[in-house]
């Protein structure tokens, strides 16, 4: 099968050089045999002469004496004849081997895919009762990733056994067969021959337990709802029942699995009306039973049918030249353009997940879902009154408790009683109390040991400086506040300066913050506004924002006890600025203060930027916003779609950009997922199907009709992460070899 190398399988006309070489070798061997024969005859005459002489001398022992030399002569003759013959065979083998090694095209490759020659029960058989299927091929085959690529429909709750056995495939169904039902075993492209991996192609075996077999098909694509990425390996199924509860209680009727492009084909469908669903089936029961499972659903009803249609089939002479284009009749199964948008529901069940005390000065509590009523902590081995600075996350699902008192920070174990709201088995919110032991990952003894080592190293360093007569310090430096300042040298006019502190602040003195702008050669005071940084995850969500600020300000004011701030200035193009912060402008809850800081930066000229405007049509006044994306599909700017259908982006640096539009039905400025029990689809997302190249001083306008192009053809390939796998095809190595030799390629070999 593999690389045809045996001489019997080679065609003489393709190997004239090798045949001529072998003939020369045979002629040479014949000459050698003649010489050996002459030598043998001479030796025979010598032996016979010696024998006659011995007969005359010893008459009594003639028989014995004559037999011995005669047998010896026969042995010598055999050796003399076998030696050249063995040498000849060895030379032929060496030459044949050399011909193969030195000739990379020593034989044609097997490029014929395997063929199905039969099956029991017969393919498309009816009134079948057997649960074991055997499919026979004309050569040895293998199945690649059967657990991923082979799908049995109707779905099997107990996994069938599927294996390749030489020239056949054995399938054993474990579930009981349903009456009057069409069964399909979709192998997709999993079947190849054993040696060269020539693909059989998409192959589906089917049979019916009733008197007729169903042959209709439906096809489509599954995409991630929030970014239109193809979803690979998810189940897509049909329900003939229209009730929404079927997806929650009953396994799918017929199923398929999506490929790397997100495409699916459900085969063996009976005429009728259906609803289509997709499911990342975590527990293998073919229904939506876990809220963490990714799903997709369509509220539309489909009716599978088939029509006679025509399609173009292109025949290629080689990889570059078209040989012919033919019009071919085929049966077109519809619908074949279903698009499902997959999403994960927001987890609303609340329960305690875990605790952390990685740093000695804070405790983190993690919950599955946020709650506007924060947990209550009661200290069991300390007084919890005024012991914490409480910092909730944006979604209120992670609560950080900063320990105010250093005595508590230095305590390795804190025992607390935690009371919080959780969801019970009936879905009701109830109060739950747990006892927790909070252990510091960095024990006090280790921290003191590290501090002592740090001081010893510092003292040694100062001693060396003193010994060399250089300047040294006599007082161990006071630790400064943990602060990160984000102020790039070139600050875009629509950006601000960000401050991030490692620990909540106890004091902010804005009188020690100074911003200067340079006009000509002089520096002038420039106005600014210093405030806590708004959480982007809460943008537009008034309810979440209210809960966040209620929790965040329960024991602190708007500046103190926070960790993130921004400085907003009146940034003017082509102007230099200097930010100067006096020492002790900031102090954290442990008394650490900020040092003197001076940071210079410039706002570039408007000539360094371009602008981009989208004229958006077909959205009928629905609230929308556009996100400008980088080459990694990450949003870098956001702009609302105005009432006149435009979205504008200013201060764009030179580069390549992409864009997506989000239909913001609740007008909260962010994408929201769906909820199946309420029949709520995730918010729609559309991609501009081209990249936009921006240049300095350019004003670019693009017209965009988001609903005009099919959803599965919108996202540009350049930013699509789930790439389509290369389709399995014959490698065409014989064609390449024939082109290299300047001869016609062989016809397909009959197996």
Regions found by a protein language model. Name each.
Residues 3, 22-29, 33-37, 49-55, ...:
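N-terminal targeting or signal-anchor segments and their processing/structural boundaries
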Residues 11-13, 24, 39, 45, ...:
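Polybasic, lysine-rich low-complexity intrinsically disordered segments
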Residues 3-5, 15, 45, 49:
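Short N-terminal alpha-helical targeting/association segments
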Residues 4-9, 17, 31:
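Short, low-complexity, charge-dense intrinsically disordered segments
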Residues 15-18, 84:
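Intrinsic-disorder-associated interaction segments
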């Amino acid at each position: 099968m593999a690389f045809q190398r045996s001489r019997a399988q080679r065609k003489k006309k393709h190997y004239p050089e090798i045949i001529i070489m072998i003939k020369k070798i045979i002629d040479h061997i014949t000459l050698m045999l003649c010489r050996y024969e002459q030598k043998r005859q001479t030796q025979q005459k010598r032996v016979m002469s010696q024998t006659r002489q011995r007969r005359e001398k010893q008459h009594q022992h003639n028989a014995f004496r004559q037999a011995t030399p005669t047998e010896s002569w026969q042995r010598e003759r055999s050796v003399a004849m076998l030696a050249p013959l063995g040498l000849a065979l060895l030379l032929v083998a060496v030459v044949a081997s050399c011909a193969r090694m030195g000739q990379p095209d020593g034989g044609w490759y097997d490029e014929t895919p395997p063929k199905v020659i039969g099956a029991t029960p017969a393919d498309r058989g009816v009134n079948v009762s057997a649960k074991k299927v055997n499919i026979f091929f004309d050569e040895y085959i293998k199945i690649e990733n059967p657990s991923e690529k082979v799908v049995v429909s109707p779905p099997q709750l107990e996994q069938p056994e599927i294996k390749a056995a030489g020239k056949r495939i054995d399938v054993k169904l474990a579930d009981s067969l349903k009456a009057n039902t069409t069964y399909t075993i979709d192998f997709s492209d999993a079947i190849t021959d054993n040696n060269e991996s020539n693909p059989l192609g998409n192959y589906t075996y089917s049979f019916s337990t009733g008197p007729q077999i169903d042959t209709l098909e439906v096809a489509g694509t599954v995409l991630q709802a929030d970014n239109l990425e193809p979803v690979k390996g998810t189940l897509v199924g049909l329900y003939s029942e229209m009730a929404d509860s079927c997806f929650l209680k009953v396994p799918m009727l017929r199923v398929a699995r999506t490929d790397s492009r997100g495409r699916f084909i459900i085969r063996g469908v009976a005429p009728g009306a259906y609803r289509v669903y997709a499911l990342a089936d975590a527990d293998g029961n073919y229904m939506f039973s876990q809220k963490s499972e990714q799903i997709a659903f369509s509220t539309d009803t489909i009716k599978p049918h088939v029509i006679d249609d025509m399609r173009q089939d292109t025949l290629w002479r080689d990889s570059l030249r078209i040989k012919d284009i033919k019009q071919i009749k085929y049966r077109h199964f519809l619908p074949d353009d279903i698009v499902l948008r997959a999403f994960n529901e927001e987890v609303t069940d609340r329960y305690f997940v875990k605790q952390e005390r990685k740093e000695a000065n804070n405790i983190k509590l993690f919950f599955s879902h946020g709650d506007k009523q924060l947990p209550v902590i009661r200290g069991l081995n300390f007084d919890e009154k005024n012991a914490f600075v409480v910092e909730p996350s944006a979604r209120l699902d992670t609560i950080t408790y900063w320990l105010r008192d250093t005595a508590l920070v230095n305590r390795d174990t804190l025992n607390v009683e935690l009371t919080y709201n959780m969801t019970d088995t009936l879905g009701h919110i109830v109060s739950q109390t747990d006892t927790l032991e909070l252990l510091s990952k960095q024990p006090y003894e280790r921290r003191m040991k590290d501090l002592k080592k740090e001081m010893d190293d510092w003292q040694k360093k100062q001693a060396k400086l003193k010994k060399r007569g250089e300047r040294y310090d006599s007082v161990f430096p006071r630790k400064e506040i943990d602060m990160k300042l984000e102020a790039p040298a070139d600050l875009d006019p629509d950006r601000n300066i960000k401050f991030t502190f490692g620990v909540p602040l106890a004091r902010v003195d804005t009188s020690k913050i100074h911003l200067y702008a340079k006009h000509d050669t002089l520096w002038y005071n420039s106005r600014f506004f210093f405030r806590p940084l708004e959480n982007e995850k809460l943008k537009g969500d008034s309810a979440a924002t209210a809960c966040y600020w209620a929790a965040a300000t329960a024991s602190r004011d708007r500046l103190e006890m926070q960790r993130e701030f921004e400085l907003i200035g009146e940034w003017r193009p082509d102007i230099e600025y200097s930010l100067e912060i006096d020492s002790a402008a900031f102090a954290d809850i442990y008394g650490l203060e900020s040092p003197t800081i001076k940071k210079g930066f410039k706002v570039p000229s408007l000539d360094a930027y371009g602008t981009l405007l989208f004229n958006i049509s077909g959205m009928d006044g629905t609230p929308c916003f556009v996100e400008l994306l980088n080459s990694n599909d990450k949003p870098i700017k956001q702009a609302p779609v105005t009432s006149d259908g435009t979205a504008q982006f200013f201060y764009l640096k030179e580069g390549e950009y992409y864009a997506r539009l989000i239909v913001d039905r609740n007008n909260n400025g962010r994408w929201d997922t769906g909820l199946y029990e309420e029949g709520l689809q995730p918010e729609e997302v559309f991609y501009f199907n081209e990249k936009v190249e921006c240049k300095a001083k350019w004003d670019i306008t693009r017209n965009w009709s988001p609903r005009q192009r099919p959803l599965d053809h919108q996202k540009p390939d350049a930013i699509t992460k789930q790439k389509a796998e290369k389709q399995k095809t014959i490698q065409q190595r014989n064609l390449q070899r024939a082109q290299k030799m300047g001869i016609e390629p062989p016809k397909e070999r009959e197996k």
